[in-house]
Structure formats: structure tokens, C-alpha cells
UniProtKB/Swiss-Prot annotation:
GO cellular component, one term: ribosome
Taxonomic lineage from the root: Bacteria, Bacillati, Bacillota, Clostridia, Thermoanaerobacterales
Keywords: Ribonucleoprotein, Ribosomal protein, RNA-binding, rRNA-binding
Gene: rplI
Name of the protein in its database record: Large ribosomal subunit protein bL9
Role description: Binds to the 23S rRNA.
UniProt entry tagged with the keyword Ribosomal protein: yes
Record-level Gene Ontology MF annotations: rRNA binding; structural constituent of ribosome
Length: 147
């Protein structure tokens, strides 16, 4: 019996796959529990259309992320922080600070996507990675200056 899995099933397959299972397993376990649907022509066609729509959406998100990465790479942020002698900061610069500076420039980026390569505890120039999409990262220059 051919079925289309609705959810991931251990030792059978992942959601969206068309798999061949024994008639009893399909009819008595997978179908009643809503883990799969029968692989009729209409269901297979609907699955293929859904996959195409998801792929198109994924491509669009990737293009938008690449455009955003290009804009962010040309950006330079200046953060004014309280600092003591020798440029040592009282505290450190966090992803929240960078998020707020980006919001001021018109970019709405979640702080979870901002990754520091090193701890920012002194004044100077740093580069921060912003993960926009799987495989798309932008480097933003951050100048930390004393108030």
C-alpha cells in the first residue's frame, strides 16, 4: 500500500514522503492515527503542488536574505558606550545593543541572529556576523566609542 506521510514516522520516513508499507500497517495504524494519507492521484498531485509552492517561497526568502546581506555589509554602526580609562568598557556590548542600533537604521533583525566573534569589552572596531538565512551571513562593522 502506498501512503503519503503527514508526520515523521520512525523507521518509515519523513513527512511529505511517499512510501510503500504493508496493507495492515497502513490501514490499521498509519491512516487511523492521522500519520499518513492514501497515495491517490489527487493526493500526490496536491503534494507536488505544495512542494513546488514551498520551494518557490524558499527561493524568494533566500533572494530577500541575499539583498539584505548586501545592504548590511555596506553598513557601519557606531555605538556610544560608557568607558573608563584606556578604553575599557563598563560592561560589554551585547547583541541587544546592536539590534537597537540596527533598528535606528531601519533594519528589523532579531538579536538571536546576531553573533559576536569575540567579546566586546574595549573601544575599537569589531565585525559582527548576522545570520539572515541558512548559508547567508552578513558582516557588519561596529565601531565602539566612549561617551
Amino acid at each position: 500500500m502506498k501512503v503519503i506521510l503527514v508526520k515523521d514516522v520512525k523507521n518509515v520516513g519523513k513527512a511529505g514522503e511517499i512510501v510503500n508499507v504493508s496493507d495492515g500497517y497502513g490501514r490499521n495504524y498509519l491512516l487511523p492515527r492521522g500519520l499518513a494519507i492514501e497515495a491517490t492521484e489527487s493526493n500526490v498531485k496536491a503534494l507536488n503542488e505544495k512542494k513546488k509552492a514551498e520551494e518557490k517561497k524558499r527561493q524568494q526568502e533566500l533572494e530577500e536574505a541575499k539583498e539584505m546581506a548586501q545592504k548590511l555589509s555596506n553598513l557601519s554602526l557606531v555605538l556610544k558606550v560608557k568607558a573608563g580609562e584606556n578604553g575599557k568598557l563598563f560592561g560589554s556590548v551585547t547583541s541587544k545593543d546592536v539590534e537597537e542600533a540596527l533598528k535606528e537604521k531601519g533594519f528589523d533583525i532579531d538579536k538571536k541572529k546576531i553573533v559576536f566573534n569575540e567579546n566586546v569589552k574595549t573601544t575599537g572596531t569589531y565585525y559582527v556576523d548576522i545570520k539572515l538565512y541558512q548559508g547567508v551571513t552578513a558582516k557588519v562593522k561596529v565601531d565602539v566609542v566612549a561617551e
